Regions:
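Long insertion/accessory domains within large nucleic-acid-processing enzymes
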Residues: 734-778
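Metallocofactor- and cofactor-centric catalytic cores in central/energy metabolism, strongly enriched
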Residues: 333-337, 344, 575, 763-770
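Conformational switch/transducer regions in large eukaryotic molecular machines and scaffolds
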Residues: 25, 43, 731, 753-754
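Contiguous, well-ordered alpha-helical segments that form the cores/surfaces of helical PPI scaffolds
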Residues: 562-575, 596, 750
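Conserved catalytic cores of very large enzyme subunits
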Residues: 99-103, 109-558, 579-580, 584-747
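Charged, amphipathic alpha-helical regulatory modules used
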Residues: 2-117, 768-774
């Protein structure tokens, strides 16, 4: 015992992991030993823990280790615990040691990330360009990244199951929006009609039900902004035309009344405006309809009432015709102004602590009422006009619904609006086109029920089917809860051409993803209405209007989707067969087999759990570079697979592959029916498409005829901010002849569904992808 008491004096310093020396502190060793005993349920007294510590120091001294490293001390603790008959405690100590190492490693990694965020400009930091909709150089953009990266690492360490955490970290799967794991859901299709009825609140006082189209427009922007602050993804208005048509109708009524008051005063010299207002109010209250199309009955009743006031019948009729004509004209003008304001607002207002412009989408095209047509026409004209200096608006993402009988063929009520949509998209890249007649969309459509019309989020997300409640297979008030993507190329590489082995591992990863989605859902389900003051508190999410502030949201969240995605089908097929699906019929057959199998498996999960598991063609932005970077380190350069900076998005034909627009559509169309959580097909066209709208329309028509669910056409949209020229700009501006040495040209390009006005915001992988994009001929 005398020797044991003397040993501590022999060790005075220790070498830490970073190479620095520090004072030797035996109490730290004793504390670690104590925790290891407690972890196994074995308890000893302090004297015994100290005795083990003394044994450790004695062995170090006997081995002539006078200045040990931390690792040497820990090795010796394990050895002494085993010799003293405590194998379980030794195992607990090993786990404790491993956990401490993991925390240290995570801490070091996080600090390195924080250093990049703090001291590097976004052009030198890929992590600050992870999302092109966030300006990583601003104070709020930087703060958002601090919180995001810290949250991700905390969840990896303490919240995720170890198997989910390691699969994500190692690049087998990718848990999207991991920074919001314990907080909220992804996105929602907002029903403006329901939200605006009787008004709503954003937390600082109530907003009345809007009465004019300008108010409808402003409140639509506020709804998008407010809901985005409750969710981590984008926001979409499912019924933009139907919803704002009510505002047009109210505006027409107000305009007609104003013009009647003015004209009766001027022509009939009747100046009692209050009496005219009371007549209108009474007629409307008693059910008389006054609208752009249906006004004859109202005007007859109005005529009778005004005659009672002693006004000449001929003068009344003259005033009515004047008021009708000018009310329609004024309503159209005011609607255009409101749509211009909406476009400007959604490109200038901010959400999420000022770091982002709301990621917004609007769906329209099917409302054939006069008021709905005015909305559709004027939102398209506002988009065509652009921003203040003619710039192409980045938001909202416009989605024009296409359907036979409504707008696809000549003679149909909204055919002129489809033609206008093609014209505007050929200039501004929006709108995109959603095809209601695609079989997997048409199966839900019920005429006269707009809530059954398919609606997409801008990037591609789709919510329609509902195994939780088949009576509510609608778009309104529903959205995605979360999604996780599989690294298909890696499974293809590991299979080494063995298809059976490929599907075996694919099934393992599918089950892993679905299990992770369930874990995340359980966290989300425990949230309360008060955690989502707008989304749930204002009844935006389906059925949430029936809940109180302290109710949990589990039941209503079951209407949402739990989504598995995939990336790199093309590279996966190259790894398995040597060719991708664009260049080989056999590869295409295998590709369809792979994606249909994935859909079959998520459908099984959906039926077993009675939750809406679904499959998405992943819109990878940061992920396209993340997976391939990890795989390149593991497997090196594999031709056509890991020898570039990005994996190809979802089921797309590689961007570098030369093919025609029609052929690309033909190849990708079969995959749309399997990806029920979302999909999109793009083609890249060359030249100024605004000068060849007929060719543009032919491509859109081919998409519809081949069963595409959602599609769009990419083409160059450049602008010189100096002279204002908009079109295709090479090295020099065709408008003024200058180059961009002093002021760069604006080059609008699409990234994972939305537009970006400068390539500076693209991450390295997406920059490489844009460079590789080839044009598709007709």
């Amino acid at each position: 015992m005398v020797i044991l008491k003397q040993q501590p004096n022999q060790l005075t310093t220790i070498i830490k992991r970073d190479g620095r020396t520090a004072m030797f502190d035996e109490e730290k060793i004793i504390e670690a030993i104590k925790k290891s005993f407690q972890a196994t349920g074995e308890y000893q007294n302090y004297t015994y823990y100290r005795e083990i510590c003394s044994d450790v120091m004695r062995v170090l001294f006997e081995r002539n280790i006078s200045v040990p490293t931390v690792e040497q001390v820990q090795d010796m603790v394990e050895e002494v615990l085993m010799k003293k008959g405590h194998p379980h405690v030794a195992k607990a100590y090993i786990l404790y040691r491993a956990e401490r190492s993991r925390i240290r490693e995570m801490n070091t990694r996080l600090m390195q990330i924080y250093e990049d965020i703090t001291f590097k400009d976004s052009k030198d930091s890929d992590i600050k360009r992870e999302n092109a909709n966030v300006n990583g150089d601003t104070a709020m953009g930087t703060m958002l990244k601090y919180g995001s990266e810290g949250a991700k690492q905390y969840y990896e360490m303490f919240i995720l199951k170890p198997e989910h955490s390691s699969a994500h970290k190692d690049g087998d799967i990718h848990i999207h929006d991991l920074d919001f794991l314990t907080m909220t859901t992804t996105c929602c299709q907002i029903d403006l009609i329901k939200l605006f009825k009787d008004g709503f609140s954003t937390g600082h006082g109530a907003l009345r039900e809007p009465k004019y189209i300008s108010s409808y427009s402003a409140l639509a922007c506020i709804a998008i902004q407010s809901n985005q602050n409750d969710q981590h993804g984008g926001q979409s208005i499912a019924n933009f035309d139907y919803g704002l048509a009510l505002g047009v109708k109210k505006t027409f009524i107000a305009q007609y009344l104003d013009h009647m008051i003015q004209s009766l005063g001027l022509i009939a010299e009747y100046d009692d405006a209050e009496s005219i207002k009371q007549i209108h109010k009474a007629l409307l209250k008693n059910g008389a309809e006054l609208s752009i199309v249906n006004h004859i009955s109202f005007m007859a009743l109005e005529l009778a009432e005004l005659k009672k006031l002693g006004i000449n019948e001929n003068l009344i009729e003259k005033c009515q015709q004047y008021s009708l004509k000018n009310a329609i004209k004024s309503t159209d003008r005011d609607t255009y102004k409101a749509m211009v304001a909406l476009v400007h607002n959604l490109n200038t207002m901010h959400s999420r602590a000022g770091a982002q412009t709301p990621f917004s989408s609007i769906n329209y095209g099917m409302d054939t009422s006069a008021e709905g047509r005015i909305v559709i026409k004027n939102i398209l004209l506002a988009l065509e006009a652009g921003m203040g200096n003619g710039e192409t608006p980045i938001f909202p993402i416009h989605i024009f619904r296409v359907k036979e009988g409504i707008n696809f063929n000549e003679g149909e009520p909204n055919y002129d609006l489809f033609k206008l949509a093609c014209k505007v998209s050929s200039k501004r890249l929006f709108p995109n086109f959603a095809f209601v007649d695609a079989p997997f969309n048409l199966q839900y459509y019920k005429e006269g029920h707009p809530e059954t019309e398919v609606a997409y989020m801008g990037c591609r997300t789709r919510v329609m089917g509902n195994v939780h409640d088949p009576e509510k297979e609608i778009t309104y008030g529903r959205g995605n809860l979360s999604f996780t993507s599989i690294n298909l190329p890696r499974i293809g590489i590991k299979a080494q051409g063995n298809i059976e082995n490929f599907f075996t591992e694919l099934d393992e990863k599918i089950d892993l993803c679905c299990d992770q989605l369930i874990e995340r859902f359980r966290i989300q389900a425990n949230k309360k209405v008060r955690n989502y003051p707008f989304l749930m508190g204002e009844g935006v999410w389906i059925d949430s209007e029936n809940l109180g502030p302290d109710d949990t949201v589990e039941e209503v969240l079951k209407h949402g989707t739990l989504t598995m995605g995939f990336i790199g089908l093309a590279e996966c097929l190259i790894a398995l067969t040597g060719k991708h699906h664009g260049e080989s019929a056999e590869a295409q057959e295998l590709g369809i087999k792979i994606v249909s199998h994935m859909r079959k498996r998520v459908d099984e999960w959906a039926q077993n759990m009675k939750l809406n598991f679904s499959l998405i063609a992943t819109p990878a932005e940061g992920l396209s570079g993340r997976f391939i970077k990890i795989d390149n380190k593991l497997y090196g350069d594999i031709k056509g697979v890991t020898d570039k900076e990005y994996y190809t998005n979802s089921f797309h034909v590689p961007v570098y592959y030369n093919t025609s627009a029609f052929e690309k559509i033909n190849i990708e169309a079969p995959y749309h029916k399997f990806t029920n959580a979302g999909h999109i097909t793009y083609v890249e066209m060359d030249g100024d498409m605004s000068k060849n709208v007929d060719a543009f329309e032919k491509v859109i028509r081919h998409m519809k005829e081949t069963g595409i669910g959602y599609g769009s056409i990419n083409h160059p949209v450049d602008r010189d901010p100096v002279c204002g020229f908009t079109g295709i700009i090479g090295d020099k501006c065709p408008g003024c002849g200058r180059d961009e040495s002093e002021f760069p040209f604006e080059r609008i390009r699409r990234i994972t569904g939305y537009l970006v006005g400068t390539l500076d915001r693209f991450n390295n992988a997406k920059l490489a992808e844009v460079r590789d994009r080839v044009k598709h001929n007709m």
